[in-house]
Amino acid sequence: MLYPTPIAKLIDSFSKLPGIGIKTATRLAFYTIGMSDDDVNEFAKNLLAAKRELSYCSVCGNLTDEDPCAICQDQSRDQSTILIVEDSRDVSAMENIQEYHGLYHVLHGLISPMNGVGPDDINLKSLITRLMDSEVTEVIVATNATADGEATSMYISRVLKPAGIKVTRLARGLAVGSDIEYADEVTLIRAIENRTEL
């Protein structure tokens, strides 16, 4: 159907979001148009504020509005363990289960030889630098159970083991090909409790 240009542009904008197809984008566009001016202004203000005010923690790479992030500043956390994840959504998933109390490191991607993504293309150098000046004794690799997640975990293991750092992987309660952010709390708790050494 042919929509007026402002609606068509709004539909196009919504459809660029992950997991949003044309039908959902159309519903969101029409819902937004039906909102009060105050609600639309608040939505736009919050969207712009999130984009402007958030950045990546200089220590762990997590999305934050302060630097270093609240997790890195929290001295009550276990300073001897770092859990490595693909992105900030995985940090949120792990924090929601309230079972892990160590630190994090966010890679912002995975090694993917098929897509031309190597170790230098993700946030690994800062991890190695961070580990040199720390009391970390264990690194838990919590990448997704995919080919790229496995390639990344094996690379991390090969790099860190010679330095005497214990490298473990989440237990396989997680289905192969699944994303950590979508796993239920019980599965994540068991995956941490039953992690295996690489």
Swiss-Prot record:
Zinc-finger ranges (C4-type): 57-72
GO term, biological process aspect, one: DNA repair
Domain Toprim: 80-175
Classification via PROSITE patterns: RECR (PS01300), TOPRIM (PS50880)
Record has RNA-binding as a keyword: no
InterPro entries in alphabetical order: DNA_Rcmb_RecR (IPR000093), Rcmb_RecR (IPR023627), Rcmb_RecR_Znf (IPR015967), TOPRIM_dom (IPR006171), TOPRIM_RecR (IPR034137)
UniProt keyword terms in alphabetical order: DNA damage, DNA recombination, DNA repair, Metal-binding, Zinc, Zinc-finger
Gene3D superfamilies reported for this sequence: 3.30.60.80, 3.40.1360.10, 6.10.250.240, RecR Domain 1 (1.10.8.420)
SMART domains: TOPRIM
GO molecular function: DNA binding; zinc ion binding
Domain of life of the native organism: Bacteria
HAMAP family assigned to the protein according to its UniProt record, in alphabetical order: RecR
Similarity comment: family membership: Belongs to the RecR family.
Biological role: May play a role in DNA repair. It seems to be involved in an RecBC-independent recombinational process of DNA repair. It may act with RecF and RecO.
Protein name: Recombination protein RecR
